[in-house]
Amino acid sequence: MLNHNIKYEWITLVREKWIVILLLLFFSITLFAVRNGNEKVEDRNLSITKEQEKVVKLDAEFTADIDSVTRKLKSPPKKSWLDPRSLSNIAWDAPRVVAMEAVPLALVSTGQSDLFTHYAKPKIYGEAYTLGFSELSNPVQLLFGSFDLAFVCIYLLPLLVLAFSYNILSADKESGVLKLTFSQPVSVYQWLLSKLALRYVILSSIVMISVVAALLFYGVSVADNFSAIAKLFALVLSYMLFWFLVAFVVNLFGKSSGNNAVTLVSVWVVMVLLIPSVISQLSNTLYPVPSRINMIHQYRVAEAEADKNANEILKTYYRDHPELAPKDTTKENQYAWILSYFASSELVNNSVKPILDKYDKALAKQQTWVDNLRFLSPAILLQNSLNDLAGTSTAHYADFRNQVIVFADVWKGYFKPRMFANEVMKAEEMKDIPKHTHNSENVRNHFASDLAGMIFFVFAILATSWTIYRKYTVAGILSI
């Protein structure tokens, strides 16, 4: 009986032509969403490439100028700060680009990428934590978010599922067909589950075909990224299954189509909109982040105080670091103007460290709060994992920020001892300047835990549906 039921359900769906319409509609939406994501990725890669090309050009110019001065083909400038061999010139004018390259699936989810910059250029002067890691963006766009594949899957796909499953039982009941159907030896539970299963298979196929086609159209290799795409489908299909089962439970109550629609939309609002908003707001309330403006202000105040006592601080610094003390005190160091900065920077950093630590701890607590409570909503689980797959999660940008700070110390560490030794740059040394390679392997991946959370929701809804069916059938409430 169930086989006949599925067969005739398929024939009915095909005759209504909604499968073709759904395929075209969802493919169009998916293609548009992936196009939007691809545009952002292309802009991101273009901006990084431009900065990297500037560095290559500057290196070539410095190398040529240094070689010309060294070989006396060109007279050295009278002022040291104009000399191409000056370490301070290279350290300030030709900083390396610390870039956060986009991963292949970055076009899937915008995540935090519209809030943070994807590259930084630490210099010899200034501290890395004072760099601007925030991107200048249209505030209206930030308010409404980005229409990407993640948005389609998290917000629109559940509505599509509910639209084609809210009245499966009620429509037949209202038309009088249901009594004829149940004159056959089949339970309402099996009958309804089989019809929803068919719709799930159809919609899942449409989703997978649309997503793969859109990714291929915009140059994402399925073979090279098979593992990531498989994870994407595992998450999205589990998310869809959850919403089909929610519709299954609501249909089991045997209410009218209008009642079902209102109930399902209410569940969507709570799960997709309300719970994530409440968690986000509570994280900001419970763990407020200190003002970044105040942190930079404190840094500048400490810097101004250090400037007043620069000479004394430098003498103390030489006592603490005798290896950097000048060996020939009769010769003036051409970098004297910046050596006092190096000496005072440690003092300044120590004065602002408590504020910086408080800032980092508050951010960490906020993220921990959200991570722990993400299991309250499958929408948060899906968003979290899609951001991980796209490399646009909060954790990815926090890791990038830390890498910038570490490389800033490496950059200074290369030039600082040489400046204290009053050295100059040689043409052949330009190739030995430190470079940075971004690596996000240390960023924690939440795929396994998020998928487990999604599966838990699926089994919880299944258990709820069976409990409701048994209870209502025994009580005689579930009437056909």
Model-derived features with residue positions:
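Transmembrane alpha-helical segments and their membrane-interface loop/helix boundaries
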Residues: M1-V140, W268-I480
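Helix-loop-helix units of permease transmembrane domains in multi-pass membrane transporters
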Residues: H4-N5, V14, A163-S204, Y472-S479
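A structural motif at transmembrane helix-loop-helix junctions in multipass membrane proteins
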Residues: E16, I21, L237-I275
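Selective transmembrane-helix segments that form parts of the transport pathway or gating/packing helices
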Residues: W18, L157, V188-F217, I455
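Secretory targeting signals
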Residues: I29-V41, K54-A60, F133, P139-D148, ...
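Long, hydrophobic alpha-helical segments
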Residues: G145-A171, S175
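Hydrophobic alpha-helical transmembrane segments of multi-pass membrane proteins
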Residues: L149-L156, S165, F233-S238, A452-F456
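Hydrophobic/aromatic residues in alpha-helical transmembrane segments
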Residues: V161-S165, V246, T464-I468
